[in-house]
């Protein structure tokens, strides 16, 4: 589960780089939404992993 938390976090960072830096001007809105979605998924996966004790 921790693996998935790290994967979601990396995807969130990549989406943030594209969305907040203006590299992909046409996809700014989508990148910002993806950043939030994957950041929430990363946090949720990390918390579930901690609660399971693995």
Curated annotation (Swiss-Prot):
Keyword Flavoprotein in annotation: no
Main location: membrane
Residue stretches spanning the membrane: 5-25, 28-48
UniProt subcellular location: Cell membrane
Annotated GO CC locations: plasma membrane
Pfam families: DUF1328
UniProt keyword list: Cell membrane, Membrane, Transmembrane, Transmembrane helix
Bilayer topology term: Multi-pass membrane protein
Family: Belongs to the UPF0391 family.
NCBIfam families the UniProt entry points to: PRK13682.1-1, PRK13682.1-4
Name this protein carries in UniProt: UPF0391 membrane protein Tbd_2238
Lineage of producing organism: Bacteria, Pseudomonadati, Pseudomonadota, Betaproteobacteria, Nitrosomonadales
């Amino acid at each position: 589960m921790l693996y998935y938390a790290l994967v979601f976090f990396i995807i969130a960072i990549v989406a943030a780089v594209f969305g907040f830096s203006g590299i992909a001007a046409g996809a700014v809105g989508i990148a910002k939404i993806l950043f939030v979605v994957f950041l929430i998924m990363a946090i949720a996966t990390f918390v579930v992993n901690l609660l399971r004790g693995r």
